Amino acid sequence: MCSTVKLDAVAFSEQWAAAWNAHDLESVLQHFDENVVFTSPVAARLLPNTADVVRGKSALRNYWTRALQHIGNLHFVVEAVYAGMDTIVINYRNQDGGEVNEFLRFNNGLVTEGHATYLIPS
């Protein structure tokens, strides 16, 4: 695999999934910048006032805390990892078997931008 991201994208995705599967938000959040911007259709549903854009690490912690309260059986299985110039995409299946792609942009080793995208069933 040719990776141009200055981190081991596969190792990152494994740590990311392990932290999520342990429901350990602080371990997930340690990889995120204080000024991170994150979008997700789930955020739009759980936090309608955000218009699906979560701004800042504190707001992201709040969103993910609420998400874990609503999805107590949350579990991710990484299917594939893609690396770009300053980005990785983690393709995974969630606890319902749904396919999700998480796009993460890095700067100085921290995620500054993230986007959760969900497969639209045909």
Where are these regions (language model features)?
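Short, low-complexity N-terminal intrinsically disordered segments enriched in polar/charged residues
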Residues: M1-Q30, E34, L110, S122
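Hydrophobic pocket/interface hotspot
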Residues: W16, V28, V36, G56, ...
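A solvent-exposed, acidic/Ser-Thr-rich amphipathic alpha-helical stretch
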Residues: S27, D33-E79
